[in-house]
Curated annotation (Swiss-Prot):
This is Protein TIC 214. Its main location: plastid. GO terms for cellular component: chloroplast inner membrane. Belongs to the TIC214 family. It is a multi-pass membrane protein. Residues 249-261, 276-287 have a biased composition (Acidic residues).
Length: 1858
């Protein structure tokens, strides 16, 4: 088994080694590169598909493989890589090849035309074709990685190359892997090509296949061309790209030193030194700057010329050295006269320009390597002129020592590596033996251990001295910083900003006060001041290192130009030459004066020696202006050492900046692409020079036309904004734009997420589906309750959507016209043509035709009315966006920018004119329709590019008139018909009367005929009619009528005529009677059946219902039988003992009332009480706690019988809990009730009666409803307390029992009797804790006892949460939730969070905990149970002097905090003697280090906003003086005697608190006089006072108008906005639109003479807003804000926070200022302020713990200086004793090896007794990963710690110091 496992292990290790070997990895990466198929494969496929022969296929494959092999070799072979990687090299190779390829393709046509070639020439041509195929595949394989973009897979080999040691083997194996992949790809391609001819569908179309094969070459050429054009369109060619304007060198020299990055040297040379410097060359400068040899020779010639000059010659020599391959040139002052200075410079610059044109190499001309080729955005810094190159991260690989080992750094500084290589080459004795890796590491470990040991010993020794309690040595034991002094005697240091020995957050910004213009403007000052100012400023620039956050003003401007020389000469004219000559003989040797030489000695600089040295520098250029000669005394060089910052050599601007800078000059094409915009001129002021008669010259000089223009931006998507012109577009993949105007780019993968794609934009699929299914199912939609309201809402919504859709359509149409070439000119000409046709041809023709028609119809013509309306129509020319100009003035550049034509008062042709009265009514209806815009088709539109509106028809009034006339004709016709009908009725009446006397004659005639029938029937035979009746019978008798009919017919023929008539008559009568009887019987039978069925159905239904009801009742009775029997027995039990309980409760009540009277007489309780106030729950609690083995609860109800209590605040959980505490009934009485989780169904009245007997609520109460104790009740209670509104993740992170203690637990209101039995064991523990505090007078013991108590029982924390659930209704006396239920008169019991407390207890105003719930809060959650917070939402004080803040707060919180309100017990001392003011314990006296801008809205005026969110996060550090005192600096709020009183009470109050005590004590006497009184009246007074003081903003301003002027108000608001808030003022959006509409009308009115009609019509149409016109010109800023014209909105800014600020924030968020809450941690400052408080002065209130014998630092390492501290932490962090010689640090990856490592958020911290010290150790550990980040920042070339954000809190060991 062992052998097998050994073999198996060896086999596994062998497999791992094989997989990790270089060969296998190379094969894998090479195989992956096969999938990077690019355009180079097109030639390979072309040879295979076109089937041009085996030779071409072989040549194509060979060329393809050869090209790929060269690419792999170029990775390893540097010259080949450089040759293939340089763009100009590849371009030089490709261009001739493409030219040859073009002629080669055309040669075939030439040879086919001539037909003179022989067989040999054809063979040669075929051979050349094979070679051409080889070259195509070879070259395009090389070009794939450079001209055309390569994929990630092709770059994998390059990436892994840097990790591989055996590079050649890796390259070979990767090539073999690629070859294998290529072979498989070609085999697959051959199978596909073999399958294509075998397919039946392809074989059936042989003609198409042959055509496709013949055109295959053309198809491949087209595909290749499209691919190249596509990629070249993204990456423009360097030759074709736009050439940017480079800053000329003369321009750079004339501007600033910063733009050109020059190193300026001011020198006065000796001949010897010049000779030495001419022969010396700086190798580093020559290597870096690449000076031309001709330039060097030119410099030598200039220096030789300088040697020939005399010693008295005055010479300025300016040397400008340009970096980054910029040519080096020199400008010399060749003439001695200052007047020829500019002339000499111009000549030299001109020569230099002409020289540079011929000197510029061809490569730089074709390929500008300084320009942008990538899609970079030109991020310009306003503090610099030229943009800085973003070249911080230079990927340069070099080996460097790291953690004791040689490692490859990919961002090693190139200059440093070059310098090290130069040193190794220069120093031949560099023979130091290189240690092995292990030896090097061991040496590094040893040195680190030694450093750590020494520093730890030093730290321990300092700590031991501090523990000896010698105050005199405390200052000495603190390690101090090294500072640079100005004066040793006065101990004046340099400012932290200027001190080079300090770094980090102390390095501030330097503001330059003196520039060239300032110096020139100060010529009138004295000479000494001028000299001192000039040269001190110069030395100031040399000495101090400038930060990036200041605006550079280089010193070249100070020495460059004639004005500066004149200034120097004037300033030195009154100073004698001898004085400077004598002073110049000073023995200082400052030949090479620099910053490093000053700071190396680290000594103080004497001011006197500074002055002498400065004067000594001046005597080199002393000038006597009388004889105009110069004196050269000594050669002194002052060199500026500046860091070379790589900058772009281009100064690019966008369109707006170009217009601003070049208003008078001719504007050039800007270099940056800005948002597409057009400048639309809306007004031109040409009237300013109309009255003056001037010449042409004066006109050209003075007649500057003023133009008012608007900028019209394009509404289409702008993806190219701020991109430099000529740079390639962003290579975005998987993004498509299918719309013409698309705001955002979308990926094709997310088309289903978009509402409407471009395929289905015309209709909605869901709507169609709903319609189909609705019709299919034939179901009508159900009626809704608020159907009408929803319909109106839907209509409004649809109207808005339609309006927005129309707006989008109009924008799309306008942008379409604006993007198409020459579209604006075509559209403009069409509009002008339509305007002319409408105005002068169509409308006059219609007027003429109408009036002629009226004349032909014999009506009066309306020439005057029509012509008047026609003349009234105005065709106003507008800009493209609708700004009106005039009828005759066209917009500027309207052919390119576009034009609109607006028709005012459009003419409408009418067949006739109405009277004036009726026309006025119609005008009012159509006042908004008296303008329109002309379309290109001559139609009228409401808006530009809108849909044409429906025009009124000419014939419509005619049709209406004809309809009216037809109606009249119809009316007349109907009248005639009515008359005819009436007459017809009369005629019929007469006819009826006539028929009345004819009827008797007829009857008589019938009677006579009957008589004749009796006498002679044969006589009337011919007159009779024979009728055969067939009776209607059922189907059974269907055959019978037929038989009867036949028989009857036979009988009729043969029988006697006399007997027939009688028989027939009898049969007819019989049949009629039979049918009638039968029908009646059937009808009666049907009716009877219906009645019987209805009755039976109703009976069945009633029976079923009764059965179901009985069944349900029976089931319910069975289910509830147990509880019913219990309740029945309990009801009998209660009724029996009801009287007994009532009598017993009355007796006990009387006993306790008498006892209470006796207690009130004593001095134990001195409570302020209200006679009409009953603390309901507290009385219950006290009476219950004072009753031993009692069976009832006693209520202490006052004598007022009109009190009603709202039981909505009492939950059923609380009632059940109280009931369960009764010993008699707990086991039996309400056991079933307590088991039921809801309101008990059958015992509601019983429970109410029981509660009344127990005194839980009054018998007269109207509110007897008891809430349910469901889980939802608990959730609702949590929702009411909005500090519990947390996310699920935060809830899981919380420890619920700790957080419940944190938020809800307060101090106890102690009971009167020391022997009283408390409600539960938790309250006993709290009382013991307070008793322990009282005995020891040490408030620090609270935390220690709390921590010990936490370890007693683990289930205690969970019981606490359940206990709170059971007792959350008891909100007064419970230590968990101490809130009062106070009733005044008939006032209902209200839910109140605010508690009446003693002196040391203050208000808990809850805040949202989810804003400050971070990791720091959860660590010490239950340490301080009584954290005090203050709600800054109530900080809306009025602006006046004497503010009764305490009374104001009492009124707002609905309680009263009285000074005389005390809480004492028999054995317990009161907790605090000092009454702290509410603003003191909040901790707002700290100095605010920054202004909160997380949500920066105004917090001083209540109408703006209150700084609530920022206060919620850090309630203890908000400076209250920023809220109030700084705004009232002109008011004397406090008095000094009040400060003295408070200082006597509390000698430990800090100096910052005095201001607040002044604020408090202004009304202290008034508050003391209040004493005890009626709480209700006090509350009423306070509320009234609060109402009086809390005025609105406008009332406050009215009040201030009496005291201050208008300017003071504006200054105050400006002060408020600028200093304390980061805000900006902007226009309201609606006001902005109204202003634009007014401007459009103003542009037209300015061009009109008579504006009355246009103004009135514009106001009627709503185009002109009168409220905007009423805005005053000099309106105050406050009034503009008040009226809503200006809106204050925040500015989102970024704050850079220093190290101290981060410390202060970290501790300030997590800790509450305990010395201001309860006086626990009152500090005593025994440390000297000059030394210690200078460093930690603002944080010392958080450092002390109140113990006189011990001073608690954050961590003991604070004894050391920050630099030493950081070094110690880094050495400890290395943990070198546990390391092995491995490649990784186990401290960062193996948590088990870390000592004292714990989880970051641990529920139970094993800490010392003093949690405060533990917490600070947690916050400031012994080492931090941030320190490593700071140490290694240069290894990574990054300026921030963003790379270490994930590992920032990886491990924080707590107590390891050494």
């Amino acid at each position: 088994m062992i052998f097998k496992s050994f073999l198996l292990g060896n086999l596994l290790s062998l497999c791992i080694k094989i997989i990790n070997s270089v060969v296998v990895v190379g094969l894998y990466y090479g195989f992956l590169t096969t999938f990077s198929i690019g355009p180079s494969y097109l030639f390979l496929l072309r040879a295979r598909v076109m089937e041009e022969g085996t030779e071409k296929e072989v040549s194509a494959t060979t060329g393809f493989i050869t090209g790929q092999l060269m690419m792999f070799i170029s990775i390893y072979y540097a010259p080949l890589h450089l040759a293939l990687g340089r763009p100009h090299t590849m371009t030089v190779l490709v261009l001739p090849y493409l030219l040859f390829h073009f002629f080669w393709k055309n040669q075939k046509n030439f040879t086919s035309i001539r037909n003179a070639s022989t067989r040999d020439s054809m063979c040669n041509l075929r051979n050349l074709n094979i070679q051409c195929v080889f070259l195509n595949n070879l070259i395009f394989q090389l070009l794939n990685h450079f001209i055309l973009p390569s994929s990630t897979l092709a770059r994998l080999v390059n990436i892994y190359m840097f990790r591989c040691n055996n590079k050649m083997l890796f390259v070979t194996s990767s090539f073999v892997g690629w070859l294998i992949g290529h072979f498989l790809f070609m085999k697959w391609l051959g199978l596909v090509l073999f399958w294509i001819p075998q397919n039946y569908s392809i074989r059936s179309n042989k003609y198409l296949v042959s055509e496709l094969r013949n055109s295959m070459g053309r198809i491949f050429s087209i595909l290749l061309f499209i691919t190249c054009v596509y990629y070249l369109g993204r990456m423009p060619s360097p030759i074709v790209t736009k050439k940017l304007k480079e800053i000329s060198e003369t321009e750079e020299g004339g501007e600033s030193e910063e733009e050109s990055n020059v190193e300026t040297t001011f020198e006065t040379r000796d001949p010897k030194q010049e000779q030495e410097e001419s022969t010396e060359e700086d190798p580093y400068l020559c290597w870096e700057e690449k000076e031309d040899p001709e330039k060097i020779d030119e410099r030598k010639e200039i220096q030789v010329n300088e040697k020939e000059k005399t010693k008295n010659e005055f010479d300025f020599h300016f040397k400008e050295t340009y970096y980054k391959d910029n040519p080096v040139h020199e400008d010399s002052y060749l003439d001695t006269y200052q007047d020829n200075w500019q002339l000499g410079r111009l000549k030299e610059d001109k020569k230099q320009k002409t020289y540079l044109i011929y000197k510029k190499p061809l490569v730089n001309f074709l390929f500008d390597y300084k320009r942008w080729n990538r899609p970079l955005r030109y991020i310009k810094n306003d503090r610099f002129e030229n943009v800085v190159r973003n070249e911080i991260s230079q990927y340069f690989f070099y080996t460097c020592p790291s953690d004791g080992k040689k490692r490859i750094s990919f961002t090693y500084p190139l200059s440093l590596s070059t310098l090290s290589e130069m040193i190794e080459r220069k120093i031949f004795l560099y023979t130091t033996e290189k240690l092995s890796h292990e030896g090097l590491y061991n040496y590094w470990v040893y040195t680190n251990e030694q450093k750590k040991y020494n520093m730890s010993n030093e730290l321990l020794s300092r700590i031991k001295v501090l523990e000896k309690e010698k105050k005199s040595l405390v200052i000495d034991m603190l390690e101090k910083r090294t500072r640079l002094y100005n004066d040793e005697n006065e101990q004046k240091c340099l400012h932290k900003t200027y001190d080079p020995l300090l770094n980090g957050p102390y390095r501030g910004t330097i503001k330059k006060l003196y520039s060239k213009n300032d110096l020139i403007s100060n010529r009138n000052r004295t000479t000494e001041d001028a000299i001192e100012t000039f040269w001190i400023n110069k030395i100031h620039d040399i000495l101090y290192i400038y930060n990036d956050s200041r605006k550079f003003e280089h010193q070249k401007n100070l020495l460059d130009g004639e004005s500066v020389l004149n200034f120097i000469g004037n300033s030195l004219s009154s100073i004698s030459i001898g004085k400077f000559y004598l002073e110049s003989t000073h023995s200082f040797n400052l030949k090479k004066f620099s910053l490093l030489s000053l700071l190396a000695e680290q000594k103080t600089i004497d001011l006197e020696s500074q002055a002498k040295s400065l004067k000594f520098r001046i005597d080199g250029i002393t000038t006597d202006l009388n004889d105009e000669t110069t004196i050269r005394n000594k050669s002194i060089g002052i060199e500026e050492i500046l860091k070379k910052v790589p900058r772009w050599s281009y100064k690019l601007t966008n369109g707006l900046e170009e217009e601003d800078e070049n208003e008078e000059e001719s504007t050039e094409d800007p270099g940056l692409r800005s948002r597409k915009a057009k400048r639309v001129v809306i007004y031109t002021d040409n009237d300013q020079n109309t009255n003056s008669i001037t010449t042409n010259n004066s006109i050209s000089n003075n007649d500057e036309v003023e133009e008012v223009a608007l900028i019209r931006y394009s509404q289409q998507s702008d993806f190219r904004r701020d991109i430099i012109k000529g740079s390639m577009r962003a290579q975005r993949r998987k993004t498509v734009t299918w719309e013409m105007f698309q705001a955002n780019m979308h990926s094709a993968l997310f088309l289903d997420r978009i509402d409407k794609t471009f395929f289905f934009s015309s209709f909605d699929i869901s709507e169609m589906r709903n319609i189909i299914f609705r019709n299919w199912l034939r179901r009508e939609p159900e009626l809704r309750i608020s159907e009408c309201e929803e319909e109106t809402k839907e209509k409004g919504k649809k109207y808005k959507e339609k309006k927005e859709e129309n707006k989008r359509i109009r924008i799309a149409i306008s942008e379409t016209w604006d993007t198409i070439i020459f579209a604006q000119a075509i559209r403009g000409s069409m509009l002008i043509t339509q305007s002319f046709l409408r105005k002068y041809i169509i409308l006059p023709s219609l007027i003429i035709a109408k009036n002629i028609g009226r004349i032909l119809l014999f009506q009066f013509p309306e020439w005057d009315e029509d012509l008047k309306e026609w003349n009234r129509e105005m065709h106003v020319k507008c800009t493209y966006n609708g700004v009106q100009l005039s009828e005759t003035e066209f917009p500027k550049d309207w052919l390119t920018d576009g034009i609109q034509i607006k028709i005012l008062f459009p003419f409408c042709l009418k067949p006739w004119r109405k009277p004036k009265v009726r026309s006025n009514l119609t005008k009012k209806k159509r006042k908004k329709e008296n303008f329109c815009f002309l379309t290109i088709w001559g139609m009228e539109a409401e808006l530009p590019f809108g849909s044409p509106r429906k025009q009124s028809s000419f014939f419509e009034p005619i049709y209406k008139e004809l309809e009216k006339k037809m109606r009249k004709v119809k009316k007349k016709f109907f009248r005639v018909l009515r008359v005819f009908k009436e007459r017809k009725k009369g005629f019929l009446k007469v006819r009826k009367e006539k028929t009345g006397w004819i009827l008797p004659i007829v009857l008589i005639r019938k009677q006579i005929m009957k008589e004749f029938e009796k006498i002679n029937p044969i006589f009337l035979f011919k007159l009779s009619k024979v009728k055969v009746y067939e009776p209607h019978e059922k189907k059974k008798n269907d055959k019978t009528p037929n038989k009867i009919t036949r028989e009857s017919s036979i009988q009729i023929r043969s029988m006697n005529w006399t007997n027939y008539s009688l028989i027939e008559k009898k049969m007819k009568d019989l049949a009629d009677r039979t049918l009638t009887t039968r029908n009646q019987i059937e009808q009666i039978t049907k009716d009877n059946k219906k009645i019987a069925i209805i009755c039976d159905g109703k009976r069945l239904e009633s029976r079923k219902k009764i059965f179901q009801i009985l069944k349900r009742q029976y089931i319910r009775l069975l289910r509830k039988s147990d509880s019913f029997m219990k309740s029945f027995i309990e009801k009998i039990y209660i009724n029996i003992f009801l009287c007994t309980i009532n009598i017993f409760s009355i007796n006990i009540q009387l006993f306790f009332e008498s006892k209470k009277k006796n207690l009130n007489k004593s001095t134990i309780y001195n409570d302020e009480t209200n006679q009409n106030t009953m603390n309901f729950i507290s009385t219950l609690k006290k009476s219950f706690s004072n009753t031993i083995n009692s069976t009832t609860l006693i209520t202490n109800i006052s004598n007022n019988s009109n009190i009603y209590y709202n039981l909505s605040s009492l939950s059923q959980a609380y009632v059940f809990y109280i009931l369960s505490q009764t010993q008699l009934f707990n086991k039996y009485h309400l056991r079933s009730v307590l088991h039921y989780d809801r309101t008990y169904p059958f015992l509601r009245d019983t429970i109410k009666n029981y509660c009344m007997t127990q005194g839980i609520f009054d018998t007269k109460s109207r509110y007897k409803k008891i809430h349910k104790s469901e889980i939802n009740e608990w959730k609702n209670w949590l929702r009411d307390h909005y500090q519990y509104k947390l996310s699920q993740t935060k809830w899981f992170r919380l420890v619920p029992q700790k957080w419940g203690n944190k938020v809800n637990k307060h101090y106890i209101i102690q009971n009167k009797d020391k022997d009283s039995i408390k409600l539960d064991s938790y309250k006993k523990e709290k009382d013991q804790l307070i008793h322990y505090m009282k005995q020891n007078h040490n408030y620090d013991a609270v935390d220690s006892l709390t921590s010990q108590k936490e370890k007693l029982k683990k289930h205690y924390r969970y019981d606490l949460l359940s206990h709170e659930y059971m007792n959350y209704g008891n909100r007064e006396d419970s230590y968990i939730y101490e809130s009062t239920l106070q009733v005044n008169g008939n006032q209902e019991i209200s839910y109140n969070l605010y508690t009446m407390k003693a002196e040391s207890y203050y208000i808990l105003i809850t805040i949202v905990i989810n804003d400050y719930l971070e990791e720091g809060y959860i660590v010490d959650m239950d340490q301080n149970m009584n954290r005090k917070y203050f709600d800054s939402r109530i900080l809306c004080f009025p602006i006046r002097k004497n503010i009764d803040i305490e009374a104001w707060i009492n009124a707002h919180i609905d309680t009263k905090i009285n000074k005389n309100l005390k809480t004492e017990t028999n054995n317990y001392q009161k907790l605090a003697k000092k009454k702290l003011f509410v603003f003191d314990w909040i901790g707002m006296n700290e100095e605010r280090l920054y202004h909160k801008i997380s949500n920066p809205e105004p917090w001083f005026f209540p109408e703006f906003w209150l700084l609530f969110n920022a206060y919620k996060i850090k309630p203890q550090i908000i400076p209250i003086q920023l809220l109030f005192l700084n705004f009232y600096f002109y008011e004397n709020i406090s008095q000094s005697n009040n400060i003295n009183l408070d200082q006597k009470k509390n000698p430990h109050i800090s100096s910052n608190q005095k201001e607040y005590l002044e604020f408090e004590n202004s009304n202290q006497e008034k508050n003391e006089q209040q004493g005890q009184g009626d709480l209700r009246s006090d509350l009423r007074k306070q509320k009234k006072k609060d109402v009086e003081e809390n005025h609105t903003k406008s009332e406050i301003k009215k009040h201030k108008k009496k005291k201050q002027s208008k300017s003071n108000k504006e200054a105050e608001l400006y002060f408020f906005l600028k200093k304390y808030l980061l805000f900006q003022l902007r226009w309201d959006d609606s006001l902005n639109q109204r202003m634009i509409d007014n401007i459009k009308v103003y542009c037209l009115l300015l061009r009109l003479i008579n504006t009355k009609e246009i103004v009135i019509s514009s106001i009627q149409r709503g185009e002109m807003c009168l409220d905007v016109m009423l805005i005053q010109k000099d309106l105050a800023l406050t009034e503009l804000i008040k009226k809503g014209i200006l809106i204050i909105e925040p500015i989102r800014l970024f704050l850079e926070r220093g190290v101290k600020l981060i410390i202060y924030q970290t501790i300030g968020i997590s800790l509450i200022n305990k010395n201001q809450t309860n006086g626990k941690y009152l500090k005593k400052r025994y440390v000297d302020k000059k030394s210690f408080d200078r460093y930690i002065g603002r944080y010392n209130n958080m450092l002390a713990n109140g113990d006189k014998n011990h001073y608690d630092f954050f961590v003991p390492e604070n004894i050391l200086s920050p630099r030493r501290r950081r070094e110690l932490r880094i050495l400890i962090c290395f943990n070198s004793c546990n390391w092995n010689v491995v490649d990784r640090n186990p401290a960062f990856c193996n948590e088990n090896k870390i000592k004292n490592y714990r989880q970051f958020l641990n529920k139970h911290l094993n800490t010392d007794t003093n949690k405060f010290t533990k917490f600070k150790l947690f916050l400031w550990p012994n080492y931090r990963l941030e320190d490593l980040a700071c140490m290694n920042r240069y290894w990574f070339d990054t300026n921030n710690g963003s790379r270490f954000s994930m590992s920032r809190i990886h491990m924080y060991p707590r107590f390891r110091i050494i």
